[in-house]
Amino acid sequence: MTTAHILGFPRIGAQRELKFALERYWRDGASADAERALVDTGRALRAEHWRIERDAGLDCVTVGDFAWYDHVLTTLAHVGGLPRRFGFDARALTLADYFAAARGNAAQPAMEMTKWFDTNYHYLVPEYSPATTFGPGVEWLFDEVREARALGYRAKAALVGPLTLLWLGKARDGLVERLALLPRLVPAYRALLARLREAGVDWVQIDEPIFSLDLPDAWRDAARPTYEALAPGAPKLLVATYFDDASEHAALLKALPVAGLHVDLVRADAQLDAFVADYPADKVLSCGIVDGRNVWRNDLDRSLARLAPVRDALGERLWVATSCSLLHVPVDLAHEPRLDEELKTWLAFAAQKTREVAALRDALVKGRAAVAAEFDDAAVVAAARRTSARIHNPLVKRRVAALTDADARRASAYSVRAAAQRARFGLPLLPTTTIGSFPQTPEIRRARAAFKQGVLDHLGYLEAMREQVRIAIDKQLAYGLDVLVHGEAERNDMVEYFGELLWGFAITSNGWVQSYGSRCVKPPLVYGDVYLPEPMTVGWASYAQSLSAKPVKGMLTGPVTMLQWSFVRDDQPRATTALQIALALRQETLDLEKAGIGMIQIDEPALREGLPLKARERAAYLDWAVRAFGIAASGVADDTQIHTHMCYSEFGDILPSIAALDADVISIETTRSNMELLDAFETFDYPNEIGPGVYDIHSPRVPDADEIERLILLALERIPAQRLWVNPDCGLKTREWRQVDAALAAMVDAAKRVRQKVEEAAPA
């Protein structure tokens, strides 16, 4: 019979139970009681998620999709591959060890973190050296198998594949080619798979999303011998590709000695024909037809029409699935009591998507009539959404149509603007600043909660937030920073805050998704045309500026990041939606400038993240992304300084586009890579000013001034002192004030030391 399954379920819990359990564990110093509570929470969450999958009608539950912090790190723990610098015993790895690799400890900094393909999820980057070894690791996956079987479930295991695990890592300490480690890694996977078979697991989903990339020949050539080595003695293997088109590798994948393949038909519907043609008779084909990355309800009739010919060709060898893991969507729409009722009918979260998968399976097996009520309701909703008046704003459409190329360019060249800005601000060499946010303290959270609950009135809330702005300004002045920020106390999230104030956006109550570890975000829903009804940030920036003679930056989130970190409407091109957001931000920058704010930061941390996985599609994306930023930033005068910020990014392949943004100052995350990201600037003459991060804010570890000084000196090897800024990697929202106080004082001290050295070395 046609099988219904999903590639993975969100692990945070419907009420973010995992987040809070993790934070209690860390706060309690990883005590035995705290660890027991954390382990119990994980076990309860897995049981609940499997219950949802069973009740939806799926044919199996997925185990191995759970992770305490990150599934790539967990895979490394399974195969004994954590970085050697930590000195951990792979077979005796504890939760404390695992978290030390993720978050750093007193002896070692945390593992580097970067985006999982083109999503907003972050994984921990494996570290590979000539000395790297693999072997038996933790028992966690087998614990999950035993739990599922004890509850009576048929379990399919999920693992990050060996090729993807190597591809995602970084070569260090003289290792020339990561593939050289494959002969060491494959035996560890073989042993893991053999044990899964012994444990009674029939199917193992091996995630190899790198087959959606433009792979070098050496990596393609490694696929067949790898799976020829893995298949004997293993359960049935389902190799899963997702996030883009894998059709260029279709012949290779179909020839692998595995029991099935999975393809993503949401991101790359056209690839289906390449896989169905001459599909091997000994394989199942899992079709990812329900979107694992967006929240809009599936058009079941359309999906059924797409799958019916595949069913006719393959029969029971057709499996129905989500496009990718549901890690990227909220858990359950049932926890949205305050969401607009019409909008709510357009949505499906993870729990609803599991049922959509099962409903499509039922229609294929039993006929549409067997699930007519579900299909008819979905059809009515799809038609209503297409024609809803709340989606379309004629004024916005006219403004987008009237945009010209000149609207996306500053009036003067950078050299002219830089002179005007130097004259206006008079900053010292190596100016110091921060990226924007300061700690979201319990006081801030209590005030926000009281305001939302109606306990605190609007005036009381404003007064509470203004007090937090004053505290942030006073602290920055005490540190000796040169350029200040207001601290963003009023913002619960850098995208959601703006989504609450822009028309065309909607905000959920509980639509949380995991970003990394315990960090969760609540992406807004972009359901219609975007419009700015009134200024969003001017009052906060103006108040902060009134507290100091030093410049205070206005803080905005850029159009591409707003797009990338939201659930975006799927009824018009993303480029069009980006331009609508850019127009709203352009008006905000002009309002800030009019209010006397001379520096405006428009953050685009997701610019690189949005880059298509396929090289052939990147130029078009970068063209509209750069244009959107230009429209947002280019209405201001020459002496208004535009900043931007990017994080979690590899920049080498898009430096020309970053330069084309023409921001006066760009700050980037570089600490975890030990300034490696700046290597690209040795061959590309970046024309404007740049602030490479010198303090890793993702770790609770506080650097001293000597460490920061070393990083500044490394940056000076690539960036002229006249164009170098000193700042942390990212915003400081997730840190505690005691950490921030020590780190920023050290940063300012280090900058002063290096400034003195540079000035002393300058010709008289």
UniProtKB/Swiss-Prot annotation:
Stretches of the chain forming a coiled coil according to its record: none
Sequence positions that bind 5-methyltetrahydropteroyltri-L-glutamate: 16-19, 115, 519-520, 565, 609
Single Gene Ontology BP annotation: methylation
Residue positions of the active site: 698 (proton donor)
Cofactor(s) recorded in Swiss-Prot or TrEMBL: Zn(2+)
Superkingdom: Bacteria
Metabolic or biological pathway, per its Swiss-Prot or TrEMBL entry: Amino-acid biosynthesis; L-methionine biosynthesis via de novo pathway; L-methionine from L-homocysteine (MetE route): step 1/1
EC number: 2.1.1.14
Pfam families tied to this protein: Meth_synt_1, Meth_synt_2
Alphabetic keyword roster: Amino-acid biosynthesis, Metal-binding, Methionine biosynthesis, Methyltransferase, Repeat, Transferase, Zinc
GO molecular function: 5-methyltetrahydropteroyltriglutamate-homocysteine S-methyltransferase activity; zinc ion binding
Residues noted as binding Zn(2+) in the record, renumbered to the chain: 645, 647, 669, 730
Record family assignment: Belongs to the vitamin-B12 independent methionine synthase family.
Described function: Catalyzes the transfer of a methyl group from 5-methyltetrahydrofolate to homocysteine resulting in methionine formation.
PANTHER family cross-referenced by the UniProt entry: 5-METHYLTETRAHYDROPTEROYLTRIGLUTAMATE--HOMOCYSTEINE METHYLTRANSFERASE
Name of this protein: 5-methyltetrahydropteroyltriglutamate--homocysteine methyltransferase
UniProt organism field: Burkholderia mallei (strain ATCC 23344)
